[in-house]
Swiss-Prot record:
Family to which this protein belongs: Belongs to the class-V pyridoxal-phosphate-dependent aminotransferase family. Csd subfamily.
Catalytic residues of the enzyme: 364 (cysteine persulfide intermediate)
Catalytic activity: (sulfur carrier)-H + L-cysteine = (sulfur carrier)-SH + L-alanine; L-selenocysteine + AH2 = hydrogenselenide + L-alanine + A + H(+)
Main location: cytoplasm
GO cellular component, one term: cytoplasm
SUPFAM superfamilies, sorted: PLP-dependent transferases
Listed name of the protein: Cysteine desulfurase
Length: 406
């Protein structure tokens, strides 16, 4: 069955607008995806008809809002096949989720002389928290290097592990290269050394189904805004036994059991002990609607369509004069490139004049830019609402830029 891309596009009102007098070609979903009417309407309806502070309220609106919020927790747990909804913590996004793990689990479990393994392709969100933790604890941060094609040099991974390795923190899919890392093999190796595993799933969950039980990872984190949901909301999955042992890292309302000026404070059970303060309930409702939306379309069908579009895009872009494409042939979601010696910012500015939105810069992956020896790259990302015609416009735009700039 053909993927109904035009029907999908009709659900996204922003795709009807023009930029610089031309139809918008939005090729920046890896930074943040656009939102369908179903998400916009669900969040709006909550604020119009159902808003109240959650937890402890006895009135109808509060009870219903709390129930709606917890239903999304259950829904998200099914989405990634967690064993229990109580393994999921609502966070602001992937960055906060990783920082939570670093400041809670990491503070309790990392000692001087221990080491943490990351890769050279990580987003800053999966580098900086571990740098801070290692500096504070006197631990070592070890790095898996890259092959020129943008895949990890897995033959070096075994040598990085030893009996002081406490954590492997790895991206599921690179936000620059689109590389999907072989998590089962990497996690199996970590298990041989008794190390925990954190997976940054920010660039994976919108492209195919994720099964955290099958992966057997300890932590999995993703953001709602890349999954066609609202900003300011994300999910941190932690294996239940591990989560129950972790101390809170933020204090305040809703995360306590009792508070006494003389007897101290006791914590709520997990996951609520990690959700201090008033939550982003509207964002949570919107996230639930986003999960409903992609589930109704079928992640397998979305993935098949996106892969067909990716193959077409790579074939067509390879014909652009003087273009350099970065990353492996088999990839998910993104195509990073440079055009001759022209700065990515200039190329992106020209494309914007043609109504084409791409991302330019270091993509929060400065170590990766350094490895390739470039200050920046352009990045076009492909989502379920993109079309062959938009790819053709990108190719035509780049060909025109090459002709203009030489």
């Amino acid at each position: 069955m053909t993927f109904p891309v035009e029907k999908v596009r009709a659900d996204f009102p922003i795709l009807q607008r023009e930029v610089n007098g031309l139809p918008l070609a939005y090729l920046d979903s890896a930074a943040s995806a656009q939102k369908p009417n179903q998400v916009i309407d669900a969040e709006s309806a909550f604020y119009r008809h159902g808003y109240a502070a959650v937890h402890r309220g006895i009135h109808t609106l509060s009870v219903q809002a709390t129930e709606s919020m917890e239903n999304v927790r259950k829904q998200a747990s099914r989405f990634i096949n967690a064993r229990s909804a109580e393994e999921l913590v609502f966070v602001r996004g992937t960055t906060e989720g990783i920082n939570l793990v670093a400041n809670s689990w990491g503070t309790e479990n990392i000692r001087a002389g221990d080491n943490i393994i990351i890769s050279e392709m990580e987003h800053h969100a999966n580098i900086v928290p571990w740098q801070i933790l290692c500096e504070r604890k006197g631990a070592e941060l070890r790095v898996i290097p890259l092959h020129p094609d943008g895949t990890l040099r897995l033959e070096t991974l075994a040598a990085l592990f030893d009996d002081r390795t406490r954590l492997l923190a790895i991206t599921h899919v690179s936000n620059v290269l689109g590389t999907e890392n072989p998590l089962p093999d990497m996690i199996a190796l970590a298990r041989q050394h008794g190390a925990k595993v954190l997976v940054d799933g920010a660039q994976a969950v919108m492209h195919h189904a994720v099964d955290v039980q099958a992966l057997d990872c300890d932590f999995y984190v993703f953001s709602g805004h890349k999954l066609y949901g609202p900003t300011g909301i994300g999910i941190l999955y932690v294996k239940e036994a591990l989560l129950q042992e972790m101390p809170p890292w933020e204090g305040g309302g809703s995360m306590i059991s009792t508070v006494s000026l003389t007897q101290g404070t006791t914590w709520a059970k997990a996951p609520w002990r990690f959700e201090a303060g008033t939550p982003n309930t509207g964002g949570i409702i919107g996230l639930g609607a986003a999960i409903d939306y992609v589930t109704s379309l079928g992640l397998d069908k979305i993935g098949d369509y996106e892969q067909m579009l990716m193959r077409y895009a790579l074939e067509q872009l390879a014909q652009v004069p003087d273009i350099t494409l970065y990353g492996p042939a088999q990839r998910l979601g993104v195509i990073a490139f440079n055009l001759g010696k022209h700065h990515a910012y200039d190329v992106g500015s020209f494309l914007d004049n043609y109504g084409i939105a791409v991302r330019t810069g270091h993509h929060c992956a400065m170590p990766l830019m350094a490895w390739y020896g470039v200050p920046a790259m352009c990045r076009a990302s492909l989502a379920m609402y993109n079309t062959h015609e938009e790819v053709d416009r990108l190719v035509a735009g780049l060909t025109r830029i090459h002709r203009l700039l030489g």
